[in-house]
């Protein structure tokens, strides 16, 4: 076989010439190993770097059911690029998945991440992964693996995308599916830390229209920091609450807001009637509504409006649940009740 012909004096090509820096990838792994190590918990078998990550389901479960979730951070990343602020989006990534699986009653066990970029910036990627590890610590799950994909030409320089994957476990007899929710039950609302990770396409449009000084003071911090506040993780206080009383249903308030997420846990024939005066609308949402001219109904179906998690309990358990969650550091309000659905009515109404 004849050797392939090449241009005279042409040098051989390397992967680096094609835009992929293997050495940078190795440097990133070295940087993030200490972050991942801090998240280790019972059940982790082996360390980062294997072809597959191993995890043994804790022996305390008699009939464990695995619960999985995956999500991203959405266009909040575009604001992170604009601000060159990458330290909080990792927690956002973890929160979006662990809060979702928590709703089924699951204890998060482990987490994996996917970081994709056009050109790998080791320091930026390490900052993001450090935030992911911090989110894992807050939720008690192990960061046991991930993928860093450097793909020249796929993303502009300085930009990246994230995806996260969480797996948890719940005792089969303790799965929370909303089937026991009944008329007269109480809807509790746990305060959000801010916008969380949904609605940022509208947020960015409002910023474009208002053209604010993002470095200006906004209630004790910069407007940029208020906008980028990481999604609150509710895992530990709610797992503790489940050990003390019957939690009938939960809804993670993400895309679709209160009016589209609470119905996901209600049986047909039941409606959650929410009182919008039962909790204060945080200043950031007031700012967004004012500068964007956003109608109330649109606010309720795009943003969390200050409520990051809804928890449904019996009326008899409501006060005890509020006391327990407050003692754990959460802000909680009775935001509504469950009643029979009226003809032609949605399953969540805000009055």
UniProtKB/Swiss-Prot annotation:
Q: Which UniProt keywords apply?
A: ATP-binding, Cytoplasm, Ligase, Nucleotide-binding, Purine biosynthesis
Give, as in the UniProt entry, the pathway in which the protein acts. Answer: Purine metabolism; IMP biosynthesis via de novo pathway; 5-amino-1-(5-phospho-D-ribosyl)imidazole from N(2)-formyl-N(1)-(5-phospho-D-ribosyl)glycinamide: step 2/2
State the EC number(s). Answer: 6.3.3.1
InterPro entries from the UniProt entry: PurM-like_C_dom, PurM-like_C_sf, PurM-like_N, PurM-like_N_sf, PurM_cligase
Q: Is the Electron transport keyword given for this protein?
A: no
Q: Which domain of life is it from?
A: Bacteria
* One cellular-component annotation, GO: cytosol
Which reactions is this enzyme annotated as catalysing?
A: 2-formamido-N(1)-(5-O-phospho-beta-D-ribosyl)acetamidine + ATP = 5-amino-1-(5-phospho-beta-D-ribosyl)imidazole + ADP + phosphate + H(+)
Record's subcellular location: Cytoplasm
Keyword ATP-binding appears in the UniProt entry: yes
Q: Name one GO biological process term.
A: adenine biosynthetic process
Tell me the Pfam families matching this sequence. AIRS, AIRS_C
**PANTHER family in the cross-refs:** TRIFUNCTIONAL PURINE BIOSYNTHETIC PROTEIN ADENOSINE-3, TRIFUNCTIONAL PURINE BIOSYNTHETIC PROTEIN ADENOSINE-3-RELATED
The entry sums up its family as follows: Belongs to the AIR synthase family.
What's this protein's name?
Answer: Phosphoribosylformylglycinamidine cyclo-ligase
Q: Which organism is it from?
A: Burkholderia cenocepacia (strain ATCC BAA-245 / DSM 16553 / LMG 16656 / NCTC 13227 / J2315 / CF5610)
Give the gene name.
Answer: purM
């Amino acid at each position: 076989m004849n050797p392939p012909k090449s241009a005279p004096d042409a040098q051989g090509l390397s992967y680096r010439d094609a835009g992929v820096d293997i050495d940078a990838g190795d440097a990133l792994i070295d940087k993030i190993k200490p972050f991942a190590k801090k998240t280790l918990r019972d059940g982790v078998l082996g360390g980062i770097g294997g072809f597959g990550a191993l995890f043994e389901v804790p022996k305390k479960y008699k009939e464990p059911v695995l619960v999985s979730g995956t999500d991203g951070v959405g266009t909040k990343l575009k604001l992170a690029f604009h601000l060159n602020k990458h330290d909080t989006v990792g927690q956002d990534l973890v929160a979006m998945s662990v809060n979702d699986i928590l709703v089924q009653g699951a204890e998060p066990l482990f987490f994996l991440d996917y970081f994709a970029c056009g050109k790998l910036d080791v320091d930026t990627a390490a900052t993001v992964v450090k935030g992911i590890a911090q989110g894992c610590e807050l939720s008690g799950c192990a960061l046991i693996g991930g993928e860093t994909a450097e793909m020249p030409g796929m993303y502009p320089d300085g930009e990246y995308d994230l995806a996260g994957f969480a797996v948890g476990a719940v005792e089969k007899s303790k799965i929370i599916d909303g089937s026991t929710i009944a008329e007269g039950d109480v809807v509790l609302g746990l305060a959000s830390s801010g916008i969380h990770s949904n609605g940022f396409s509208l947020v960015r449009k409002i910023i474009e229209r208002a053209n604010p000084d993002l470095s200006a003071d906004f209630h004790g911090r910069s407007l940029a920091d208020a906008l980028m506040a990481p999604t609150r993780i509710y895992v530990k206080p709610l797992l503790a609450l489940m050990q003390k009383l019957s939690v009938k249903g939960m809804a993670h308030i993400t895309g679709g807001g209160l009016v589209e997420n609470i119905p996901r846990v209600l049986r047909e024939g039941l409606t959650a009637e929410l009182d919008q005066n039962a909790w204060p609308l945080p200043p950031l949402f007031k700012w967004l509504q004012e500068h964007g001219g956003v109608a109330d109904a649109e606010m309720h179906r795009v943003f969390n409006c200050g409520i990051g998690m809804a928890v449904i309990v019996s009326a008899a358990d409501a006060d005890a649940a509020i006391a327990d969650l407050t003692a754990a550091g959460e802000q909680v309000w009775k935001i509504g009740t469950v009643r029979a659905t009226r003809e032609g009515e949605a399953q969540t109404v805000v009055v």
